[in-house]
Amino acid sequence: MLQDFEICPVRHTSLIHDLYIDLRAIDTLEVNIANQNFSNYGKNDFVRDICSDDYENHIVIENDVPIAVYGISKKPINGMYCIYFLGNKILDTNLKLQKEFLKRSNAIIKEWLSTHECLFNFIHKKNNRSKRWLTSLGAVIHSDITHNGMELFTLRKGDANV
C-alpha cells in the first residue's frame, strides 16, 4: 500500500537520493532539461530542489521504496501554481502501482484545484503517457509555447475533469 508523506529533509533524504537514481527515463530527461543551466546538476541538487521551501513537497513510498515525489508551488507565478510529479521507473512496469498512483494523483489534483484557480508546468513533447493523463483531467497542452522540447500545460479549475 502506498504511503504519502510531506517531505522532511532529515527523514527522507536517502529515499529522494534513491528515487533520483531510479527515476523514469522521461522524468530524468525533464529534470535535466529544466536544470540545463546548471552544468553539474546531480543527485544532491535534486534532493535540495525536492526539499525546497518554495513548494509543498510530498514523497510516496511503498515498502521503503520511493515511488514518486510531487509538489505544488506555495506562491503563484503569473497567477498560476507550478506543479510536478516525478516517478520511479517501477511505475512503467508495475500496473498495480501505476493504477494506485494514478488514482492518488487524480485526488491530489482535485484537492489542489479546490484552492488554486490554475496549475501549470512544462512537459516534454515525447512524454505521451503523462500528456494523455493530463488531458484526461482537462489540462490543455500548449504546443505553441515551448522551451527546449518542453511544452507548457495548464489546468484550470473550471476545465478540470476530477
Report the location of each language-model feature.
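Conserved N-terminal entry element of GNAT/NAT acetyltransferase domains
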Residues: M1-D18, L23, V162
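Conserved beta-hairpin
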Residues: D54-G71
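A conserved beta-strand-loop-helix scaffold within acyl/acetyltransferase catalytic domains
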Residues: Y70-G79, S143-I145
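Conserved acetyl-CoA-binding loop-helix of GNAT-fold acetyltransferases
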Residues: N94-E111, R132, S136
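Conserved acetyl-CoA binding element of GNAT-fold acetyltransferases
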Residues: N78-Q98
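Helix-loop element at the rim of GNAT/NAT acetyltransferase active sites that forms part
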Residues: T13, D18-Y41
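Conserved beta-strand-loop-alpha-helix junction that forms the acyl-donor binding cleft
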Residues: L113-T135, I145-H147
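Active-site rim helix/loop that mediates acceptor-substrate recognition in acyltransferases
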Residues: N35-Y55
